[in-house]
Amino acid sequence: MNEAETRAELIDPKLKSCGWGIVEGSKILREYNITAGKIQTGGIRAKKLTADYVLVYKGIKLAVIEAKSDDLEVGEGVAQAKQYAEKLQLETTYSSNGKEIYSICMKTGAEGLVDDYLTPEELWNKTYPAAGSGNNTVAELADAWRVKFADVPYEDKSGTWQLRYYQEIAVRNTIEAIANKQQRILLTLATGTGKTAIAFQIAWKLFQTRWNLSAGQAGLKPYVARRPRILFLADRNILADQAYNAFSAFPEDALVRINPKEIRKDGRVPTNGSIFFTIFQTFMTTSKKIVEEFKEARLAEAAEASYTSYNFGQYPPDYFDLIIIEHSSAYAHTIR
């Protein structure tokens, strides 16, 4: 049989018998495009990377399968299976010729022939080992939020746009860190790789699930189901404006552009909204001419007064549930 026949007659039935596409929440993505192909000299693209199967459960990609004709040895697909799993940062990957299944764990390095594919629940528990413990542990609470976040689809502009594979990985890893209550997260990406798009999708999932600091701490317990307050900080107005415009899929009343003129006009910083955009310089502005005096005085009371005199000091501690910093190395001293 050729590869297409091998898939239809041997691999597909095997996946079905293991619950894939049958168990609620499980899905099989076929001919999944990982990359469009590297752009080469003259604008010609290299061959795109396409995975034969990607196994999805509870909205999260868990494994990839490289299929080969039953006329070939199962080992023929191992290198590709590893390459695709590495690209997608998946722990589990398979190569199959329909007659045999070769399993690879990218995390431990364990690999070899197996009788069956892992079921959706088995693969989930392998990827997130503490999730199936049945205890109300931090891991169990993280798993609850992991599922909530995964239930929210990426905003794709009515199907006209989709995340690149590395952008999806960045969003997934960030959301995973948030689910695990990690307080600081650093994403390092080159210019032009879509940092704002990544920030948007992270904010989108938090906004739609009504995640906030109290909710994240409560886990499975009752909590105040309010929209998160998110601050987007940039070092230049053009970047803050671009981000504000890029977040247009959010409700209009959720977006707030903080600027000095409105602060001077209203006499206070804005608080009515969910996602706030501004620059460091605006937040570090003070309307009082006492900062230098406070610095010289070095008194606790003076330090407190100095803090509240800045625009950022008008917000209560932990007012923002998430702060996204558009980091630029030229302004590293400002960020510190």
How would you name each of these model-derived features?
Residues 1-63, 68-229, 238, 242-253, ...:
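ATP-dependent helicase/translocase motor core
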Residues 93, 256-259, 325:
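Short, hydrophobic beta-strand segments that form beta-sheet elements in well-ordered domains
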Residues 188-193, 234-235, 262-266:
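A glycine-rich phosphate-binding loop feature that marks nucleotide/adenosyl-phosphate handling sites
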Residues 190-191, 327-331:
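Conserved helicase ATPase motor motifs in RecA-like P-loop NTPase domains
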Residues 237, 258-267, 279-285:
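Conserved helicase motor
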Residues 279, 326-327:
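Walker B catalytic acidic pair
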